[in-house]
Amino acid sequence: MEKRVCSFCGYDIEPGTGKMYVRRDGRVFYFCSGKCEKNMLKLKRKPRKLKWTKHYSR
């Protein structure tokens, strides 16, 4: 099984869970939850500015 990492928060995604989103230009994003998907695609937030992500910088 291939291990995947959430494109937004940086946490591991268990096999059989999560969602794969493919843009028209061919870029692929993996999301562990609807929360991550909505924050990235709809709200256009930066993971570096949210404390609950692994990419958070102080």
Curated annotation (Swiss-Prot):
Residues at which Zn(2+) binds: 6, 9, 32, 36
Keyword annotations: Metal-binding, Ribonucleoprotein, Ribosomal protein, RNA-binding, rRNA-binding, Zinc, Zinc-finger
Cofactor(s) essential for the protein: Zn(2+)
Keyword Lyase applies: no
GO molecular function annotations of the record: rRNA binding; structural constituent of ribosome; zinc ion binding
GO CC, one annotated term: ribosome
CDD domains with a match to the protein in the record: Ribosomal_L24e_L24
PROSITE patterns membership: RIBOSOMAL_L24E
UniProt function note: Binds to the 23S rRNA.
Family: Belongs to the eukaryotic ribosomal protein eL24 family.
Name listed for the protein in its UniProt record: Large ribosomal subunit protein eL24
